[in-house]
Every structure is written in C-alpha cells, then in structure tokens.
C-alpha cells in the first residue's frame, strides 16, 4: 500500500529546506540584535488555554482547532497559534519576576488549523513570532513592527506595505461596539450566518468578514478612530510618530481588526502587493494584547507581538523572483582511484568536515568519470583526486572547478590549502 501525506500538509524536501533554513536564520539573527530570546513550548496544550486566550467566539476556537482527548479524558489541542502558549509559559515560569522588562521572546515552529487548503494556506503551517511582555510603551510597539519589517527587507522583499490601526482601550472599544451594533442590526439579516452570530458577541469581527466585504454597510460602517478616547488616541499618535522617526511608511485602515479576541490598541498587518501573487496577500499580523496575561492566570502585564507565516514569506520571495543565496554547492569532492585510496578517503573526508570544509566522497563505487559527474552535480568548488600512487607519496591533486587550475599538494596540508583558497 502506498501512503500519502494528509491533506493540507507538505513535505519540505532537501533543496527547498535550504531556503527555509536561510530565512529562519534571518529571523534568528534579527532577534539576536533586538535581544529577543527563543522559547519552545509544547506542540499541544490544554484546550481551555486557547478557548480563554484566543477567544471562545473566534473562528479558530469554534471551527479550526485539532482537539482530542488523551487516555485519561483530558481535552488537549494542537496549538493553532503561538501567543497563548508563550503567555502561559511567561506566567507559569514567573518570567514576570525578571528585573529587566519587557520579557522578549520569539518562537519558530508548526501550528495546526483545520482550514480549507489553498495556495499558501496549510493545515500544518509554520510560524515565526515574537512577544514583548511587560511594557506598555509605544516605543515597544514601534520596535516590534520594525523587527518584522527588517526581516522582510533582509529577505530581499521590496513590495511590502504596513497597514496600521488602533483598537483602543476597553472603554473605547465598548463605545465602538455599541455603534457597530446600532449600524448593522437593522439589516443584519442580509449578512452571512457568522456575521449574524457575531453581532452581539463580537461585532468588530463583522468588519473582518470575507463573504460580505462588499456590502454597502461595510463601506459606511463607523470608524473606530472616531471612538478612541483621549488616552488611546494619544497612544496611537505616539506609535505613528515613532514609525515616522524610523522611516517606516504605513497606511491607516480603520477596518483592520485582526481575527483574535485579545487585541487592543495597536493592530497591524504586513502585506505583499507583488504582482506574482495576483492579489494583496497578508504576510504577517499582530498587535497589542494588554489584559491577556491576567486573563490566563498571570499578573497585570501588558504585551505586544506578531506572527508571520514562513510559507507566505517564501511565496512572496518567489512572487518577486528574488534569488536566495542558497544551494551554493560543497567545498570539496574527493575522487578516489583504487581500494586503498577509497579506504583512506573515509578518514580524510572526516578530517575535512571537522575542519569546517563541506566535503563528500563516492559511496557507489563509481568509476572516475562518474565521480567527476557527481562532483559537478554537487557544485563542488574543489575536486581532490587521490590515487594509490599519490597516496604512497603522501600527495593529492586538487582541481579548482571554477578556474580549471590543478596542482599537487601534500596530503597533510590539504585542509590548510583549501581554507586559504576559500578566502580568495
């Protein structure tokens, strides 16, 4: 019987995984310079964590979670997002006791949602995300956004834009929710069933509806920016000021509400408008979540973060036809002639690898011509040719595949020679 991967998943094969490692390294190195430290949380958590943290009324909790019972009847869920687990770890491990705040965390790993698979959307997908917990400072909001934009810039993307909104504090949102209910209620029957169910539970999510986005009431809906109280408006102005100071352009979209219940104040998305996508595509999204830490059992600690899809980042790179500097080939391939040379090459290739020189030998007993073809397929910069005569003389021939130049060197000096040539 032939087995196939489950629908909505993918195999990331050698070659493609090099691209993944490259962008993940950009993420890790950017986090290092911004002083964000990696956190690794379990793949599954107690279901209640996501119900409380993400929001009972969200599509994620109601429709998309992979939930199961273990052998003792406990309800567990494969993580659909990273923030709730990071905040749970922040609380459980008392990271709030650290004298230096905010606590800056990042994560990279698979998430799981039962969604309809389509281009760039999978049921197992990979996210990079950061969380800054313990500070309510507009400068932190700007820092988080700047970090995300820095990653896209380093990955070579040019067609990205930042879209920004403020969801205000609790009082601002209360006034705005009342205005939305008043606006939509008389004609709510014209909207989809999801919007109808959200009218009195979470009317902001109506603005996020894909089915009814062209409805005339969507276009005339009140703007949350008109309902921000003085404190919320001042906070948003400061965030915008810092972004301007950093030279990061942005657009304001008062209908940007994000799909999770925990957001307040700053909300943002980073989008690609590359022609290769055919439509504007969201690459990353995030915002401030003051109150979430307390909501899932911790002390009062404001926070902000974002998550970005690694699959969509790579798709954006392809859409812009950006070449990543991967698949550069190996440093050295050792061609052997004769059994004694082959036996010696096993220890020789080990020494090269231990010295940091990526190397390979023949494991298929190919003739010399076949070994040279393999060296070419692997993109070897140098080809070291070792026969039994050379071995007896403690010599080896080294060919530079770029220039065609070939020379004989002492075997014991091979590592030194290859390292010197690598620097040229």
UniProtKB/Swiss-Prot annotation:
Keyword set includes Cell cycle: no
PROSITE patterns, per the entry: AA_TRNA_LIGASE_II (PS50862)
Predominant cellular place of this UniProt entry's protein: cytoplasm
Catalytic activity: tRNA(His) + L-histidine + ATP = L-histidyl-tRNA(His) + AMP + diphosphate + H(+)
Gene Ontology CC: one annotated term: cytoplasm
GO biological process: histidyl-tRNA aminoacylation
Record-listed E.C. numbers: 6.1.1.21
InterPro entries, per the entry: aa-tRNA-synth_II, aa-tRNA-synth_II/BPL/LPL, Anticodon-bd, Anticodon-bd_dom_sf, His-tRNA-ligase, HisRS-like_core, HisRS/HisZ, HisRS_anticodon
CDD domains in the record: HisRS-like_core, HisRS_anticodon
Location of this chain's protein in the cell: Cytoplasm
Highest taxon listed in the record's lineage: Bacteria
Listed PANTHER family: HISTIDINE--TRNA LIGASE, MITOCHONDRIAL-RELATED, HISTIDYL-TRNA SYNTHETASE
Self-association and partners: Homodimer.
Entry protein name: Histidine--tRNA ligase
